[in-house]
Amino acid sequence: MGNTTSSVLDNIVQGSNFDREEVDRLRKRFMKLDKDNSGTIEREEFLSLPQISTNPLATRMIAIFDEDGGGDVDFQEFVSGLSAFSSKGNKEQKLRFAFKVYDIDRDGYISNGELFIVLKMMVGSNLKDQQLQQIVDKTIMEADLDKDGKISFEEFTKMVENTDVSMSMTLDQF
């Protein structure tokens, strides 16, 4: 990673919401996280960050960053994943990231089972499974406008349109 060529960095800058200086700072952070100098960040290295390890959705976040499903995150995936959180990221990018949290199988829809799994990660044992399932069923019923039993990205967008996703998913400093 230390030998990242200028043209590779330029391509990463072009494909993200970051400028060259921000990408360089991210590269330095990436290198610190890559404790074994493998050029990728493994799950355990991600979880060594206190901000990540205490997040109930940490495993989902890592899976979203790992775009190719290889089990680790390379620098390009790292920048791409963080790009949605940039103040220069638009609302759709932030909504797509939020949608991916729930779309575990990456089929473009949130199923009843996927919604249950992710909400279970968030509430833990604070709700009984039966109570949680009722919430999931009600959410699917309300959000599923075309009545196909699952939530598409468009339906998800309509469901959260009155919440300020842009503000809650923006980090000021990189």
From Swiss-Prot:
It comes from the Eukaryota. Ca(2+) 4 binds at D144, D146, D148, K150, E155. Ca(2+) 3 binds at D103, D105, D107, Y109, E114. Ca(2+) 2 binds at D66, D68, D72, E77. GO terms for cellular component: calcineurin complex. The keyword Hydrolase does not apply. Transmembrane segments: none annotated. SMART domains: EFh (SM00054). GO terms for biological process: calcineurin-mediated signaling; cellular response to pheromone; conjugation with cellular fusion; intracellular monoatomic ion homeostasis. Keywords: Calcium, Metal-binding, Repeat. Residues 21-56, 60-88, 90-125, 131-166 form the EF-hand domain. GO terms for molecular function: calcium ion binding; calcium-dependent protein serine/threonine phosphatase activity; calcium-dependent protein serine/threonine phosphatase regulator activity; phosphatase binding. Ca(2+) 1 binds at D34, D36, S38, T40, E45. InterPro entries: EF-hand-dom_pair, EF_Hand_1_Ca_BS, EF_hand_dom. Belongs to the calcineurin regulatory subunit family. PANTHER family: PROTEIN PHOSPATASE 3 REGULATORY SUBUNIT B ALPHA ISOFORM TYPE 1. This protein has four functional calcium-binding sites. Regulatory subunit of calcineurin, a calcium-dependent, calmodulin stimulated protein phosphatase. Confers calcium sensitivity. This is Calcineurin subunit B.
